[in-house]
Design a protein with these regions (language model features):
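Terminal presequence/propeptide segments associated with secretion/organelle targeting
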Residues: 2-5, 10, 19-655
Length: 655
């Protein structure tokens, strides 16, 4: 979720743009539609000559840090220059929650976020016999609000540049290990010192050191942390996810993609110093809007060779991983009753699929990649034209390219085992087997039981249902076939001539690691050994895994060092004129409310409830656009012309 908001004087308002909160600035820009048509014609209607493509000043985005907003540019573009009071209000009104952004929207601690950001937490507070995801939830009294476990909200109260402190701590470090240790020690010391300086005894505080420009700059972000957060309102899934996966990550959209929680301190609703007020006025097409949010991650400042590696290896393999898991889970769901948590996991996979489809498509887009190459060429020339920079950083682009070439040699192993220890994407039995092989190796080397305690816990792990475990194990064995090759020694040793489906069934029928209980018994009885079928699966890959782990770790460490030099070179050339890549920390992005050209027509700047009801009737009640029962007969006083979603030119990404 991100927040958009207008300057004081025009009236603060909130519109649901997959929940977006906005302050607007009225302006008289060149038609945003005309601008969008220009881009559309360049890239679609005309054949692009990549030799004539030129990079733009803001190709690396407009997600600004709060301590370095481009105020002169804002004033030039919008006739509006935010002052410190405005920026402070924007910062304090925004919140970071697990994986998402929220905002204070009432003087009594209500916070607004996206529907998908609340679904897993709604599942956590669901009671026996309930299905809050399907039915929605509304707490008619504060006493009825439900505290969400594992949920928190963080308010950014202070930002400080601590680059000099970190760099000073690294001066005497000579090796990679020494630098890493010194950096972590500096982070801890700075965090403790800055947290103690702001702690007023009212709530919890923590300081996080944010690395910007790949380590060229470091900022200390100090947060007030709220840990008593309670669910107050969640629309039904049919409304909060209206249009389903089809409409997700698209526009026009009509979903009421929102949820409300309330922050408490000492058992009472928190009264924030700043909150965003509601308004019925809204914005207009062409108005400037500013997004405040915590964008998760971007890779815009990477070199062309790094982006090509993403295109061919990392992002491509993650997209395939997600797509195959979606297929597996959907096949399982067709034949079995599934829980709300299962359904939410599937929705999350579909969300990631659309995200990475877009990334992979962009990385394969000749126009986009040509602009990136032009931007890199201009950067390289700027480095070479400065004698000092050329001496220090002239070879970094070739060094990074060489590292990518070496990483490609290990790509099949990386891809085959991608996220193999992730509980969302990977079989529990595979995760137990990876831990079990390490456990047995260290046990045979004489490690003490205390040293083995963490590995024992991983071997026992947590268990999925047998059906999902089998589904995910089968999918992983199919990955082995895809990346190692059906005729490879590894695949032949693991499958023994069986299909991935047959091999998964056999492993789960005979392995002590099939579930948590049997794994615990095997450890207690000391019967777990290398002959266990699941452990044998890992043993078949052990030589390759050892080589991969050693090489991959070294290459990544080298790349991090060179990337830090790249960041220092970029900062020396451009300073804060180029914003750093997203780091799931608070940013400010500027843009305009704008319609745009698509599919030979025009997407409106706003969608309304008229469109929502139109989709329900056009596609039918059993479609992804079917409304929940209580929404089928709205009261006569309900204005169907009320905007529900909007679109703008702001630079945002997930988070």
């Amino acid at each position: 979720m991100n927040l958009l908001f207008p300057r004081a004087g025009h009236g603060p308002w909130i519109a649901l743009v997959a929940v977006i909160l906005c302050w607007t600035v009225t302006a008289s820009p060149r038609s945003a539609y005309a601008q969008s048509v220009d881009v559309y014609e360049q890239r679609v209607q005309k054949e692009v000559d990549t030799d004539t493509v030129s990079a733009g000043r803001f190709d690396d985005g407009r997600m600004w840090t709060f301590d370095h907003p481009p105020l002169d540019d804002f004033e030039s573009r919008y006739g509006f220059r935010p002052d410190e009071t405005w920026l402070r209000r924007a910062r304090l009104g925004a919140l970071r929650i697990p994986g998402c952004t929220a905002s204070f929207v009432s003087p009594r601690g209500l916070i607004l976020t996206n529907h998908h950001c609340a679904r897993s937490h709604a599942t956590d507070v669901t009671r026996d016999g309930e299905n809050l995801i399907e039915t929605g939830f509304y707490a008619e009294t504060r006493a009825a609000e439900r505290r969400a476990p594992n949920f928190f909200a963080e308010q950014l109260i202070e930002i400080a540049d601590v680059t000099a402190d970190v760099d000073a701590a690294l001066e005497d470090a000579e090796t990679d290990a020494e630098r890493q240790a010194a950096r972590q020690e500096a982070f801890a010391s700075i965090s403790d010192r800055r947290t103690a300086a702001v702690d007023d005894g009212y709530g919890a505080f923590r300081t996080e050191i944010i690395s910007l420009y790949d380590g060229a700059q470091y900022s200390a972000y100090t947060f007030r942390r709220f840990e008593d957060v309670r669910l107050a309102f969640l629309p039904e899934l049919k409304l909060g996810y209206f249009g389903g996966d089809t409409d997700n990550f698209t526009y026009p959209r009509y979903a009421l993609d929102m949820a409300l929680f309330r922050v408490y301190i000492d058992g009472e609703p928190y009264e924030p110093e700043v909150h965003f007020d509601w308004s019925t006025e809204g914005s207009r097409p062409g108005d400037a809007v500013f997004v405040v949010g915590n964008p998760g991650s971007t890779s815009r400042l990477e070199t062309v060779s790094q982006l090509e590696f993403r295109r061919d290896v990392t992002d491509a393999s993650l997209l395939r991983l997600v797509e195959t898991r979606i297929d597996a889970l959907q096949a399982y769901a067709q034949d079995n009753d599934v829980s709300p948590a299962f359904q939410d996991r599937l929705f999350s996979f579909q969300n990631v699929r659309k995200l990475y489809r877009g990334r992979v498509e962009a990385l394969n887009d000749a126009y986009i990649m040509s602009r990136i190459r032009q931007g890199e060429q201009a950067f390289r020339q700027a480095v070479q034209q400065d004698t000092s920079l050329a001496t220090s950083y002239g070879g970094i682009f070739d060094s990074i390219a060489a590292i990518q070439a070496q990483k490609r040699e290990f790509a099949p192993t990386y891809q085959a085992l991608r996220l193999s220890n992730n509980p969302v994407f990977s079989s529990a039995t595979l995760r137990r087997a990876l831990a079990a092989r390490q456990y047995l190796d260290r046990q045979s080397a004489g490690a003490s039981e205390d040293d083995l305690q963490d590995l024992r816990a991983q071997v026992v792990g947590t268990s999925r249902t047998d059906e999902i475990n089998e589904t995910l194990l089968t999918a992983r064995l199919q990955d082995f076939v895809h990346y190692f090759g059906a005729d490879s020694e590894i695949v032949q040793a693991i499958l023994g001539g069986a299909s991935p489906e047959e091999a998964a069934q056999s492993i789960l029928a005979t392995s002590a690691l099939a579930d948590s209980a049997s794994a615990a018994r095997a450890l207690a009885d000391e019967t777990l050994d290398l002959q266990d079928p699941a452990v044998a699966m890992i043993t078949a890959m052990e030589d390759r895994l050892q080589t991969f782990r050693s090489a991959w770790s070294g290459l990544n460490a080298r790349e991090a060092d060179v990337a830090a030099d790249l960041g220092r070179a970029r900062f020396a050339v451009y300073g804060h004129e180029v914003p750093p890549d997203a780091t799931f920390s608070l940013r400010l992005s500027d843009g305009r409310v704008a319609e745009y050209a698509y599919n030979g027509t025009v997407a409106p700047a706003f969608t309304t409830f008229f469109g929502l009801y139109g989709h329900h009737h056009e596609y039918g009640p059993d479609s992804e656009w079917g409304l929940p029962a209580r929404w089928l007969s709205p009261p006569s006083s309900f204005d169907l012309g009320t905007p529900v979603n909007m679109v703008s030119t702001n630079d945002i990404t997930g988070g």
